[in-house]
Amino acid sequence: MEFEPDVPRWRQVAAVIRDRIEDGTYPPRSRVPSVQAIVAEFGIATATAAKVNVGLKKEGLVYTEIGMGSFVSPDAPALIKKARADDVDAG
């Protein structure tokens, strides 16, 4: 992935994962990539990859089960559609 210089890398990677949630690559209740998998796929630092998961959790798109990993929230597709609609309305 080629990163845009003016946007934090964690936000760019989060956008990719968000798109994958939206297109069904990661359906509700499915596991999302671990921090280490994000590091391997995108070539970013571990701390940056951890920010990806924190950001997606804050948006309500993923949740974590201790010892199990992070998963797509059942409400994630609806939340993404609402956020995109709000962006269009605001723009």
PLM ranges: what are they?
Residues 1-44, 54, 63, 74-91:
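Extreme N-terminal segment that seeds HTH/winged-HTH DNA-binding domains in transcriptional regulators
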Residues 59:
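DNA major-groove recognition helix of helix-turn-helix/homeodomain DNA-binding modules
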Residues 63-65, 69:
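Short Lys/Arg-enriched helix C-cap and helix-to-coil transition segments
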